[in-house]
């Protein structure tokens, strides 16, 4: 903590001494520490509106944008051309296992994940209506997801296909969100425990010669837990093969660090074959202080070592001031992140943009 404080003070002193002309991003001296933001596309916006938005991001020090086009390759292609002209790199953001409003999936009710209670996400959604999770083991549902990945990966000019919701539904919600749903989660609850469809149970039985429904306590059945961790891993690894074939990278938004992701959403991302991850270290969701951003970043960096790049995800509404955001960026950098990503673009206030510009000049 002392090291961070010293660095922060130095950071402030240096920035206060900078001349006004240096407050603009030097595009010819690109920082190795990158700044990204997630954004959601709107097909109704004009090219002129998008050009203005992309210029704004670039002038604010943003290097890369992660765009959710609802898996529309045509819209992605259009926006990629516009963004690249403004000097931005583009990633194709896709909601993977959770497919709200997917018109193809909705015609196939059997594709959806089934809870331990025997209820399908097709018509019984956990927590919120947009939680419409597909089964990771049924051939048709996983092929549908991988087909969407392939379609995006063929768009010329993108950097990566960026997987989001590449996990199961939350076994445990972040503690800061529990009051919103009037929930107490001290053990695994059957309505939030997935997937117990006939395909998953049958595949597990073929490997382990037992039915998870016969377990006295599935929460401590390590084979059943690993089966589900590996089910997500297998989709990621298959997606990696697809995007690599199309000369793109694979990236993903993930839970804060591997052990935590394992516990909360059955996502062990340090075991994946992937190029970069963006751990969503949203400290406010977990009722944590700012320094937790550094802790969670370091935990992930230590777990993956040199196997993948880590970019710390920051949730802008969690920050009460520009100084807090500045500290968060420093914490991420000092604990091994190679970039930060902000959720999401429209939340970048003028004060936050100034922080990014200043940080970009300092964190080379």
Question: Where are the regions that the model predicts?
Answer:
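Boundary/entry segment of secreted carbohydrate-active catalytic domains
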Residues: 25-51, 252-256, 316-317
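Active-site-adjacent "subsite" loops/lids of carbohydrate-active enzymes
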Residues: 92-154
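Short, acidic/polar
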Residues: 41-59, 141-152, 258-272, 293, ...
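Aromatic- and acidic-residue-enriched segments that line the glycan-binding/catalytic groove
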Residues: 99-127, 166-213
């Amino acid at each position: 903590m002392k090291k961070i404080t010293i660095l922060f003070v130095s950071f402030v002193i240096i920035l206060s001494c900078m001349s006004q002309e240096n407050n603009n991003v030097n595009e010819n001296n690109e920082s190795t520490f990158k700044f990204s933001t997630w954004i959601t596309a709107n097909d109704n916006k004009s090219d002129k509106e998008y050009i203005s938005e992309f210029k704004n991001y670039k002038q604010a020090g943003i290097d890369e944008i992660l765009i959710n086009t609802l898996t529309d390759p045509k819209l992605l292609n259009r926006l990629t051309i516009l963004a690249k002209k403004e000097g931005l790199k583009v990633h194709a953001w896709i909601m993977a296992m959770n497919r709200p409003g997917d018109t193809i999936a909705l015609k196939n009710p059997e594709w959806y994940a089934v809870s331990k209670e025997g209820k399908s996400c097709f018509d019984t959604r956990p927590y919120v209506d947009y939680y419409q999770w597909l089964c990771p083991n049924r051939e048709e549902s996983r092929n549908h997801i991988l087909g969407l990945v392939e379609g995006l990966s063929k768009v010329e000019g993108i950097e990566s296909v960026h997987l989001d919701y590449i996990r199961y539904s939350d076994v445990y919600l972040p503690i800061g969100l529990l009051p919103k749903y009037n929930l107490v989660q001290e053990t695994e609850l059957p309505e939030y425990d997935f997937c117990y469809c006939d395909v998953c149970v049958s595949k597990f039985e073929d490997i382990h010669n037992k039915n998870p429904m016969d377990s006295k306590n599935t929460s401590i059945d390590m084979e059943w837990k690993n089966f589900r961790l590996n089910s997500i891993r297998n989709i990621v690894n298959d997606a990696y093969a697809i995007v690599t074939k199309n000369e793109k990278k694979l990236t993903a938004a993930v839970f804060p660090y591997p052990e935590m992701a394992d516990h909360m959403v059955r996502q062990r991302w340090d075991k994946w074959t992937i190029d970069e991850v963006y751990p969503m270290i949203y400290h406010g969701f977990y009722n944590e202080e700012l320094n937790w951003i550094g802790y969670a970043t370091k935990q992930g960096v230590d777990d993956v070592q040199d196997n993948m790049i880590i970019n710390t995800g920051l949730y802008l509404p969690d920050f009460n001031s520009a100084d807090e955001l500045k500290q968060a960026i420093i914490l991420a950098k000092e604990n091994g992140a190679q970039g930060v990503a902000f959720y999401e673009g429209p939340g970048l206030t003028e004060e936050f943009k100034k922080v990014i510009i200043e940080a970009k000049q300092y964190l080379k």
